[in-house]
């Protein structure tokens, strides 16, 4: 899996924006990607040093549309902590 396939998009929420002050950046990642692949992808794309990676899995939720029932897509989110002295990613 290539670096551009691992990272899907950055997660921009109030909680993730507050975490940026602590050098923590949040990304939606491919559901098959592991911590090592996420670390390599962030270091390759943004040219920074990664300290650690935490991964959160979200299960699909049931949703109804009238009488029809379906599921949302499952997601995987990675919180990447950069080493001190690294450049800000989004600034």
UniProtKB/Swiss-Prot annotation:
Any one GO CC term of the record: ribonucleoprotein complex
The protein, known as: Large ribosomal subunit protein uL23
Keyword Transmembrane helix appears in the UniProt entry: no
PANTHER family in the cross-refs: 60S RIBOSOMAL PROTEIN L23A (PTHR11620)
Keyword line: Ribonucleoprotein, Ribosomal protein, RNA-binding, rRNA-binding
Top-level taxonomic group: Bacteria
Organism from which the protein derives: Staphylococcus carnosus (strain TM300)
Alphabetical list of NCBIfam families matching this protein: PRK05738.2-4 (NF004363)
Keyword Endoplasmic reticulum: no
Record family assignment: Belongs to the universal ribosomal protein uL23 family.
GO molecular function: rRNA binding; structural constituent of ribosome
Subunit structure as annotated in this protein's UniProt entry: Part of the 50S ribosomal subunit. Contacts protein L29, and trigger factor when it is bound to the ribosome.
GO BP annotations listed: translation
Function: One of the early assembly proteins it binds 23S rRNA. One of the proteins that surrounds the polypeptide exit tunnel on the outside of the ribosome. Forms the main docking site for trigger factor binding to the ribosome.
